[in-house]
Amino acid sequence: MKSVLVRDIILKKMSKERTSVDDKFIKAYIMEAFYYICGKCEPSVLTKTIREDDQVVLRNTRNNAFLIVPDEPNFEDEQEHLMIDESLCYAVINYVCFLMSKGENVMYLKLCNEIINDYISNDGKELENAHL
């Protein structure tokens, strides 16, 4: 999912609860969501076996693999995709909404965790007909 679309969905979902949020805060919330999600599962986009110079290791996983720290989203580039598996993009969106609600709207956290659990139960495989 494109980073700009993720930002727009977040702003739309939160439009009733908040007025406006600066992009730098949305980026910070997205990074926090990445860390939360990577603590619960192993996104295949971030799973590597060979380390490149510009990559920062987030944590080790099984079979000598590791997760890298994803890049911060760039909302200036309208073609850039969020650096996480497509099926986890809505987990990112919902976790950011949870953070933006200052932890008051736990429905967003519940949705985030359900998406992560679905991802884990499908062994990280993208489903052709999945509707999130």
Regions found by a protein language model. Give the residues of each.
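Conserved short "hinge" loops at termini or chain/domain junctions
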Residues: M1-H81, L111-L132
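Charged, low-complexity interaction regions
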Residues: R18, M100-V106
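Short, hydrophobic/amphipathic alpha-helical patches that form generic packing surfaces
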Residues: E32-Y35, Y90-K102
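Exposed beta-sheet edge/beta-hairpin loop segments within beta-rich domains
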Residues: L82-S87
